[in-house]
From Swiss-Prot:
This is Deoxyuridine 5'-triphosphate nucleotidohydrolase. Pathway: Pyrimidine metabolism; dUMP biosynthesis; dUMP from dCTP (dUTP route): step 2/2. Substrate binds at residues 74-76, 87, 91-93, 101. InterPro entries: dUTPase, dUTPase-like, dUTPase-like_sf, dUTPase_trimeric. This enzyme is involved in nucleotide metabolism: it produces dUMP, the immediate precursor of thymidine nucleotides and it decreases the intracellular concentration of dUTP so that uracil cannot be incorporated into DNA. Keywords: Hydrolase, Magnesium, Metal-binding, Nucleotide metabolism. The gene is dut. It comes from Wolbachia sp. subsp. Brugia malayi (strain TRS). One of its GO terms (biological process) is dUTP catabolic process. It catalyses: dUTP + H2O = dUMP + diphosphate + H(+). Its cofactor is Mg(2+). GO terms for molecular function: dUTP diphosphatase activity; magnesium ion binding. Its EC number is 3.6.1.23.
Length: 156
């Protein structure tokens, strides 16, 4: 399973047959938080405006207990082409053992072609804290600057 070493964690990964020739997820720079995921498509596909598709990555990962995988958009795809991860961030639970797939949506008014090997999203491995609910009759209602305000209450 996973082993933590100085802000690093080992995660088991297996390339599926349709992803054998693709790179493993990797960091673009030394300070990148996320690792790029690649489209493991047989043929190019077109993502039409307002269409969503589940894109295979050709990998299976074993995330250690106490961690999760987060699938996030690539900023360049979102800013330049309106392509983003629909359920962002997508969560990969530590007990999931299927292929990592990315649900992309095209929010632009132009079709977008996705080719085999395109970098389509990024994955982060992050710690997860288990919540223990404290069912309280009375909550701490100490006044705060925000109080019960939400949904735009702090200004534009």
């Amino acid at each position: 399973m996973g082993r933590i070493q100085r802000n690093k964690i080992k995660v088991e990964i297996k390339k599926l047959s349709h992803g054998k020739d693709l790179p493993l997820p990797c960091y673009a720079t030394m300070q990148s938080a996320g690792m790029d995921l690649y489209a493991a498509l047989g043929n190019s596909i077109v993502l039409n405006p307002l269409e969503r598709l589940l894109i295979p990555t050709g990998i299976v990962i074993v995330i250690p207990n106490g961690f999760e995988g987060q699938i996030r958009p690539r900023s360049g795809l979102a800013a330049k082409y309106g392509i983003t991860v629909l359920n962002s961030p997508g969560t990969i639970d530590s007990d999931y053992r299927g292929e990592v797939k990315v649900c992309l949506i095209n929010l632009s008014n132009q079709p977008y072609e996705i080719k085999r090997g395109d970098r389509i999203a990024q994955i982060l491995i992050a710690p997860v804290f288990r919540v223990i609910w404290d069912d309280a009759e009375r909550l701490c209602t100490e006044e705060t600057e925000r109080s019960a305000g939400g949904f735009g209450s702090s200004g534009r």
